[in-house]
């Protein structure tokens, strides 16, 4: 996937236990070769060159909650990186929500996995094998 192929600038998730969430995402983002890009009081971002993914305390002071039917997928560079994401997420406390593997209902090129982060947000790592598309 080309670096400029995304239509998304960035995504933010709310966290009820900010420091725990930052520790979780430090491990998960490292598995995808992403690093911390920016930090502000109550907010941290990760990416591969610009702040693509943020975790923050909700600005309105209310509790963070999950969106029913919503999830975020991170681009993996290989099937092995999908597995690394899975392993890192589970080791950091995520709940499994779909083991790594192909899902032909999403297309022959799809390979990915799903987990629930510490606040219950559904996150995914996806590898798109162009040779199978």
Question: Each PLM stretch: what is its role?
Answer:
Residues 1-22, 129-133:
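N-terminal beta-strand motif that seeds the catalytic metal site of vicinal oxygen chelate
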Residues 12, 35-38, 101-103, 127-132:
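Conserved catalytic-core motifs of GNAT/GCN5-like acyltransferases
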Residues 2, 47-88:
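Long, continuous compositionally biased terminal/linker segments
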Residues 42-44, 70, 109-113:
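Short beta-strand micro-motifs in enzyme catalytic cores
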Residues 15-20, 74-118:
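Vicinal oxygen chelate
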Residues 122:
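Glycine-rich acetyl-CoA-binding "A-motif" of GNAT/NAT acetyltransferases
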Residues 12-53:
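Core segments of cupin and vicinal oxygen chelate
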Residues 107-108, 114, 125-132:
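Short beta->alpha transition motifs characteristic of CBS
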């Amino acid at each position: 996937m080309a670096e400029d192929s995304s239509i998304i600038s960035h995504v933010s998730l709310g966290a009820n236990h900010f420091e725990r969430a930052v520790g979780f995402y430090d491990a998960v983002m490292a598995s995808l070769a992403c690093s911390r890009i920016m930090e502000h009081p109550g907010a941290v971002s990760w990416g591969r060159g610009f702040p693509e993914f943020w975790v923050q305390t909700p600005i309105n002071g209310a509790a963070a909650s999950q969106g029913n039917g919503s999830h975020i997928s991170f681009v993996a560079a290989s099937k092995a990186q999908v597995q690394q994401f899975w392993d890192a997420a589970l080791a950091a406390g995520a709940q499994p929500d779909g083991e790594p593997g192909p899902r032909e209902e999403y297309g022959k090129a799809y390979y990915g996995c799903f987990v629930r982060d510490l606040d219950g947000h559904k996150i995914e790592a996806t590898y798109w094998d162009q040779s199978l598309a």
